[in-house]
Design a protein with these regions (language model features):
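Bacterial N-terminal signal peptides that target proteins for export
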Residues: 1-6
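Short cysteine/histidine-rich zinc-coordinating motifs and their immediately flanking basic loops
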Residues: 47-52
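Short Fe-S-cluster ligation motifs
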Residues: 63-83
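C-terminal capping alpha-helices of c-type cytochrome domains
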Residues: 81-129
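Electrostatic cytochrome c docking/interface patches
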Residues: 15-32, 43-44
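The canonical Cys-X-X-Cys-His
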Residues: 33-41, 115, 119
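Detector for the c-type heme attachment site
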Residues: 37-45, 58-59
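Bacterial N-terminal signal peptides
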Residues: 8-14
Length: 129
């Protein structure tokens, strides 16, 4: 009887704590192909239609030197962390109305997991960590 209770308790504990999302950087690189029309990443990245995305996580929105951001983006007060980026990439205009970003967003949680894993590989100099 004790074993059944212990087993049931372990199962309930496991179910009450969802697994942390894990993305595949290689799959994220494929998802990033949709972003390449406007953004670059890596050691030779430059600002283009959109800002370069090196070292995205941990930096304030609207802070890449040499890129002209919308006033909405600059005044958003956002510091890019994983939860904020996940919310943003689902619908950029919903998260920051009047942002220059016209991309409609990613709808697949797996694609979002993957692109996060891909972007997190790059430091602010575009080097893979």
């Amino acid at each position: 009887m004790r074993r059944r209770i212990l087993l049931a308790s372990l199962i309930l504990a496991a179910l009450s704590h969802p697994a942390k999302a894990v993305g595949d950087p290689a799959a994220g690189e494929k998802v990033f192909q949709r972003c390449r029309a406007c953004h670059q990443i890596g050691e030779s990245a430059r600002n283009a239609v959109g800002p370069k995305l090196n070292g995205l996580f941990g930096r304030p929105a609207g802070s890449i030197e040499g890129y002209t951001y919308s006033s909405a983006n600059k005044s958003s007060g956002i510091v890019w962390d994983e939860p904020t980026f996940r919310d943003y990439i689902k619908g950029p205009q919903a998260k920051i109305p009047n942002t220059k970003m016209v991309f409609p967003g990613l709808k697949s949680d797996q694609e979002i997991d993957d692109i996060v894993a891909f972007l997190k590989q790059f430091d602010s100099d575009g080097k893979k960590k």
